[in-house]
Amino acid sequence: MMLSRAKPAVGGESPHTDKRKKKGRKIPKLEDLLSQRDFTGAITLLEFKRHVGEQEEDTNLWIGYCAFHLGDYKRALEEYENAAKEENCNPEVWVNLACTYFFLGMYKQAEAAGFKAPKSRLQNRLLFHLAHKFNDEKKLMNFHQNLQDIKEDQLSLASIHYMRSHYQEAIDIYKRILLDNREYLALNVYVALCYYKLDYYDVSQEVLAVYLQQIPDSTIALNLKACNHFRLYNGKAAEAELKSLMDNASSPFEFAKELIRHNLVVFRGGEGALQVLPPLVDVIPEARLNLVIYYLRQDDVQEAYNLIKDLEPTTPQEYILKGVVNAALGQEMGSRDHMKIAQQFFQLVGGSASECDTIPGRQCMASCFFLLKQFDDVLIYLNSFKSYFYNDDIFNFNYAQAKAATGNTSEGEEVFLLIQSEKLKNDYIYLSWLARCYIMNKKPRLAWELYLKMETSGESFSLLQLIANDCYKMGQFYYSAKAFDVLERLDPNPEYWEGKRGACVGIFQMILAGREPKETLREVLHLLRSTGNTQVEYIIRIMKKWAKENRVPI
């Protein structure tokens, strides 16, 4: 935003200046202060000159320029708006005013001021970014075509690539500029940020180290380093990296304090989320997403949905989170519509060119096929990144279900038993699938023990039904009979008696065939006697007769 200057900001020296020089005193020149990026000093000089009546041409613009570069956008806005009201104002004020509106998030005002400005490279870059903000693809492409192969335009293009999640394209531009401009150290931070977004956290650290060697107290760089540590190690390691920033209470960037508070919530696993995140929802883009994640972890699916339902997703992370929330709500409400929306979001991300070969992209395709119950396809994707999630309970939970659903109950059982989370191990989906694996793997006693550990509830009743029916199908009649017996006691449904009768007769047949111990007959008779059905006596009479003939004690 440096204003073009045809002459020095300070005019010819007055006699008073000569006198001061003779006394050995020297007032700094505006040009020198600007070249040293001493914007505070420059503002002080300009305000002093304004106060003593030595105001130079375009003083408002220069104070606005300095305030802008100090991050004091409100002060810059005040100066530029005053300058714009002047008769025959410098036309360059409009593009600078537009940039200030942009940084204040006042995009409509920025566009209006931008169109009043004379055509320039800066105006085109500004309108290019505004088109992105307004999701106006047609205007975006028009302004894109006006970009030239100069550093400022290419950096602007790289920024748009980054915001559109085209991280590799942004990296290519930054690296090309760095080849000829090694002194542009900050570009290393941008490259590191792109690698972070691509999940290459170790590469991001290496690139970031180049910048931190020169500027070790950079707020943005230290924060990114902490985020890399969070991904590579854990929250404690990340928090340790932020300590120097937290100790630096004199940081001039107010936004940094908010950023640190936000990231500490993430690093601490959601601790303090309800106190810190809500006020930041419209300040830090990730705050809304992390608050949604917090609600999901607290099983408050409805609150998560309320927070994200009106968000128009533009990044893969937003699409993924909307998919997860809709899937959770669909399961909770039994809503096919929400499940379909979730499946479409997952497919959109997983099928995109930028995400199809990333782990999140493959996770999305696995989730899409999971919702479609196409478990062979689920396994293709899960197997492609299995090595990264060996000890991850959520991954193992889904992987085991997919294995069991495709008939590989042996491996499904093994993976289910790797899960450590007590919350997952008490989930009915876990219990029912593990019970099914046990039954299919000829371990019905273990399935029965899962039921015995449960408290009486609707879920324990459902597990009984599963054990009764699956054991019957597998010819494991003893545990089928026990399950049907309990079901019959809880609910005198004729179907349960029929199941119990069939299972008891099945056990008797297995005893006759020598595939079940004869002593089991005593318990079968006990199960039958607990039923008041008229058919019981006939069945018992036949069994007793056989027992007597074969000298089996009953």
UniProtKB/Swiss-Prot annotation:
SUPFAM superfamilies (alphabetical): TPR-like
* Transport found in the keyword field: yes
GO terms assigned for molecular function:
intraciliary transport particle B binding
Region: Disordered, residue numbers: 1-27
CC per GO annotation: centrosome; ciliary basal body; ciliary base; cilium; intraciliary transport particle B; neuron projection
Question: Which PROSITE patterns does the UniProt entry name for this protein?
Answer: TPR_REGION
TPR repeat boundaries? Answer: 57-90, 92-125, 151-184, 468-501
Extract the Gene3D superfamilies matched here.
Tetratricopeptide repeat domain
The UniProt keyword set, sorted, is:
Cell projection, Cilium, Protein transport, Repeat, TPR repeat, Transport
Cross-referenced InterPro entries = TPR-like_helical_dom_sf, TTC26
Could you tell me where this protein is found in the cell? Cell projection, Cilium
Basic residues biased stretches: 18-27
The subunit structure is:
Component of the IFT complex B. Interacts with IFT46; the interaction is direct.
What is this protein's function? Answer: Component of the intraflagellar transport (IFT) complex B required for transport of proteins in the motile cilium. Required for transport of specific ciliary cargo proteins related to motility, while it is neither required for IFT complex B assembly or motion nor for cilium assembly. Required for efficient coupling between the accumulation of GLI2 and GLI3 at the ciliary tips and their dissociation from the negative regulator SUFU. Plays a key role in maintaining the integrity of the IFT complex B and the proper ciliary localization of the IFT complex B components.
Task: Write down what this protein is called.
Answer: Intraflagellar transport protein 56
Identify the species of origin: Rattus norvegicus (Rat)
